[in-house]
Curated annotation (Swiss-Prot):
Keyword Transmembrane helix: yes
GO MF assignments: nucleoside transmembrane transporter activity
PANTHER family per record: EQUILIBRATIVE NUCLEOSIDE TRANSPORTER (PTHR10332), EQUILIBRATIVE NUCLEOTIDE TRANSPORTER 8 (PTHR10332:SF77)
Protein name as annotated: Equilibrative nucleotide transporter 8
Compartment annotation: Cell membrane
Cellular component terms (Gene Ontology): plasma membrane
Family: Belongs to the SLC29A/ENT transporter (TC 2.A.57) family.
Membrane topology: Multi-pass membrane protein
Expressed in which tissues: Expressed in stems, flowers and siliques.
Species of the source: Arabidopsis thaliana
Highest taxon of source: Eukaryota
């Protein structure tokens, strides 16, 4: 099915005190903080725009723009350096994150305001564009580095979900459940998220000065010709297909189906927030497990991605099946497994795929994988929008 011969990592420059690892972890977290911030504030946006399918609209807008940028990065040989692209992306993230509180301060929490809703969707589009710039640059760069840096990035992306979920729970629980309390908690939530992104902005300017990154830049060779793109694509077509399936399944269920379709009389408005937190924790566990055990067979990992299609009938049973399945416990268990398998298989494929090609093609292979990850996100968000589960 696929050539499973893996090229051994090149000898790396010593990463003193694991600074480069920590920064890659932080940048991975920062790259997904805006997305997690938007979907975890589901209660706030549901209050402001009760007649809109906020989760599904945000997902399609964000993912479509991200994939567009990734495709352009893969096919167009940009002259912007890694550092410039990262600075641009995080600047766009910070601006987009501050739009939500600014909108609320101007309209003072008026519900159903169409102009504010369009501006909010515009900020989501800006986040999606920034995600493509940051994600493509960061993962493409890590594709040429030793495998622990790719693992650090994806562990970081998963940790961002936990950080944001806990932050949302803290801000929601610490203030009264009134319209004003909800607005104040959301303001604090987005401002703290922006502060974390500012730390990422500073860190990416430190990263390029480290010896391990100097080694990476020294051997950097742009290979973005059309011929090379498809040559590399053919070599990693199976892990890329696996990535497409992973995120088509995940995004068609999470967050839209979980946030909108599943209800709990016991937990009420806390239910979607707690389910999103469970998913984020299990996703982090899955992406961290590759530091302990890395599944070496890309063929087997790709088949495991196909097996995840079973989540469709299982979640459907939790919505329409027997009464005992339409309770909180089965949903929490399934959500945990959805996140765990998503995290582990993503990390395995993203670590292994760039190592199955020549070192000079590793960056392009990593970007190619991210493009298919993004295509999976778009497919999943569209399936979720069409209510096919």
């Amino acid at each position: 099915m696929v050539d499973e011969k893996v090229i051994v990592d090149e000898v790396e420059t010593r990463d003193a005190y694991r600074v480069a690892y920590v920064i890659h972890f932080l940048l991975g977290a920062g790259s997904l903080i805006p997305w997690n911030a938007l979907i975890t504030a589901v209660d706030y946006f549901g209050y402001l725009y009760p007649d809109k399918h906020v989760e599904k609209t945000f997902t399609v807008a964000y993912m479509s723009c991200s994939v567009l940028v990734l495709v352009l990065m893969m096919t167009w040989n940009t002259r912007m350096s890694y550092r410039v692209r990262m600075n641009l992306g995080f600047s766009m993230f910070i601006i987009a994150m501050m739009i939500s509180p600014l909108i609320d301060w101007v309209w003072k929490g008026e519900k159903g305001e169409n102009v504010s809703y369009m501006l909010m969707v515009g900020s989501v589009v800006l986040c999606g564009l920034a995600d493509g710039v940051v994600g493509g640059s960061l993962i493409g760069s890590a594709g040429k580095l030793p495998r622990q840096y790719m693992q650090a990035i994806f562990a970081g992306t998963a940790s961002s979900g936990i950080i944001i979920s806990l932050l949302r729970i803290a801000t929601k629980a610490s203030l009264p459940q009134t319209p004003q309390g909800m607005r104040t908690s959301a303001h604090s939530y987005f401002i703290v998220s922006s502060t974390i992104l500012l730390c990422c902005f500073i860190s990416c300017n430190v990263l390029h000065k480290l010896p391990v990154m100097q080694q990476h830049l020294k051997f950097h060779q742009p290979l973005h010709s059309t011929l090379t793109i498809w040559m590399v694509g053919r070599k990693i077509k199976w892990p890329a297909s696996g990535m497409l399936i992973i995120y088509s399944v995940t995004l068609s269920i999470f967050p839209g189906f979980i946030a909108e379709n599943l209800k709990s009389q016991l937990l009420q408005s806390w239910y979607p927030i707690l389910l999103i937190t469970v998913y984020n924790i299990s996703d982090f566990v899955g992406k961290s497990l590759t530091a302990l055990y890395l599944w070496q067979s890309i063929k087997s990992a790709t088949w495991a991605c196909i097996v995840r299609l079973l989540f469709y009938p299982l979640f459907s049973a939790c919505l329409r099946g027997p009464k005992w399945l339409r309770t909180e416990v089965p949903v929490v268990v399934l959500t945990f497994m959805l996140g765990l398998t998503n995290g582990y298989l993503t990390s395995v494929l993203m670590i292994m795929a760039p190592k199955t090609v020549h070192a000079s093609e590793a960056e392009l292979a990593a970007i190619f994988m991210v493009v298919f990850l993004g295509l999976g996100l778009v497919c999943g968000s569209v399936i979720g929008w069409l209510w096919l589960i």
